[in-house]
């Protein structure tokens, strides 16, 4: 009898809790004009809450997740915080517009808010770990007192032009920050000392102070036309840097001795000081660099330095090099004899009169377009699949031994004769002038 009473009381308590959570969800439905939702299956019904569209419950029937993507209009009711077990809230407002004050949600760990979010305040969520938001109006965005926050993603609305300041308060556990298309004149993250990964894309930043980010390992800052100077000298743990598509004239990475990946493509750099013997990939294409010293980078596998002002390039110490693009510089010679692992070479648009490929037996792709090269010996390059000699001065070429070749381009070149194998048939990607003659090599 005693145990029966206990069981009965427990069931009544659970029933009462479910009724309470049911009433909270009903108020949520009415506050956001749920009658206009496209998907509202079982909402306001007597069915278990986990059968309501977008609602997930635990084994006791308590709401742990709300995930809705629909037309919503109104303000999320404050009583939603009384869903004591709610851990995940994801709202994608596809039309309409909603306002939220996420304050004192006791168990909330993940918050995802996208679409027409007109106002967003997030405060005093002691368990919140991840926040991803695309508020329509960042003037009405505020976040504070979320001590467990480790991931923050913010994305601005399309075609936004009004610049704003984003000042992040202290988040001691914040390790990853993503900001996309948010038009900023200033970004203050000096109080986020544990940041390890930063991704800032198309934000029109004019300056970025990362002096307090000593734990930073990954940095991507791209698409900021007004960013001219970037000092990363205190970010000594950086492993990967992508600062492509800015207007950087000064880049300080002198203390980044753990760096393995650097992409500074499409900036306005005239010099680049590198100091990491671990560097595997370097992309400094489309800058104004006149001197590039890579002699100490024995781990370098990928080098992209095309579109600069280089008059010389010494890669003799880079014996692990696999990919090289150095086109459209001022190079008059290029020595690749020590780079036997190269499978990709693009060296067109230079002043090269010749190039020795006798040691490049792994070569699969070769391009010397718009080049004064007159002779090209490919006898050692039996793995070649692609050849581009567009606009070159080569008159004769032997491809009779290249059984893997599927792409050949020689438009606007001086080419007159191609030596081919006995059973040769032109491939689909065969681009030559009409007066070029193919001769069979016996």
Predicted regions and their residues:
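Bacterial Sec-dependent N-terminal signal peptides
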Residues: 1-20
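Short, non-transmembrane alpha-helical segments in secretory-pathway proteins
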Residues: 21-33
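LRR flanking "cap" motifs
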Residues: 30-78
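Leucine-rich repeat
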Residues: 59-63, 82-87, 104-109, 124-129, ...
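Conserved hydrophobic beta-strand positions in leucine-rich repeat
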Residues: 64-68, 89-91, 111-113, 120, ...
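The feature encodes a structural signal of leucine-rich repeats
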Residues: 76-81, 98-103, 119-123, 139-143, ...
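Leucine-rich solenoid repeat scaffolds
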Residues: 390, 395-442
């Amino acid at each position: 009898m005693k145990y029966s009473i206990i069981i009965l009381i427990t069931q009544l308590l659970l029933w009462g809790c479910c009724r309470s959570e049911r009433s909270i969800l009903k108020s949520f439905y009415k506050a956001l004009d749920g009658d206009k939702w496209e998907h509202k299956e079982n909402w306001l019904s007597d069915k278990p809450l986990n059968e309501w569209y977008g609602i997930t419950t635990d084994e006791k029937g308590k709401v742990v997740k709300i995930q809705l993507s629909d037309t919503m209009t109104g303000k999320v009711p404050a009583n939603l915080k009384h869903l004591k077990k709610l851990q995940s809230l994801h709202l994608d407002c596809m039309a309409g517009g909603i306002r939220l004050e996420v304050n004192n949600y006791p168990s909330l760990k993940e918050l995802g808010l996208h679409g027409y979010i007109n106002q967003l305040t997030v405060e005093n969520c002691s368990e919140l770990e991840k926040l991803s938001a695309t508020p329509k109006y960042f003037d009405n965005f505020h976040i504070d007192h979320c001590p467990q926050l480790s991931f923050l993603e913010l994305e601005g609305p399309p075609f936004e032009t009004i610049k704003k300041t984003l000042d992040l308060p202290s988040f001691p556990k914040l390790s990853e920050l993503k900001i996309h298309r948010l038009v900023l004149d200033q970004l203050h993250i000096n109080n986020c000392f544990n940041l390890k990964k930063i991704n800032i894309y198309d934000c029109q930043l004019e300056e970025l102070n990362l002096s307090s980010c000593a734990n930073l390992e990954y940095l991507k800052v791209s698409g900021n036309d007004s960013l001219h100077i970037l000092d990363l000298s205190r970010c000594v743990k950086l492993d990967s840097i992508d600062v492509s598509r800015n207007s950087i004239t000064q880049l300080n990475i002198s203390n980044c001795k753990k760096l393995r990946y650097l992409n500074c493509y499409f900036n306005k750099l005239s010099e680049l000081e590198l100091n990491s013997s671990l560097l595997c990939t370097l992309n400094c294409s489309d800058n104004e660099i006149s001197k590039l010293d890579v002699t100490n980078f024995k781990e370098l596998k990928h080098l992209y330095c095309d579109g600069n002002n280089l008059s010389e390039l010494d890669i003799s110490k880079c014996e692990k090099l696999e990919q090289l693009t150095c086109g459209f510089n001022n190079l008059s010679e290029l020595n690749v004899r020590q780079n036997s692992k190269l499978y990709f070479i693009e060296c067109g648009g230079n002043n090269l009169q010749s190039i020795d490929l006798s040691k490049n037996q792994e070569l699969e792709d070769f391009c010397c377009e718009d080049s004064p090269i007159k002779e090209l010996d490919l006898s050692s390059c039996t793995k070649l699949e692609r050849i581009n000699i567009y606009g070159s001065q080569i008159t004769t070429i032997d491809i009779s031994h290249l059984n893997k070749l599927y792409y050949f381009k020689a438009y606007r070149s001086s080419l007159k004769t191609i030596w081919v194998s006995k059973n040769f048939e032109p491939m689909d990607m065969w681009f030559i002038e009409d007066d070029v003659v193919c001769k069979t090599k016996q």
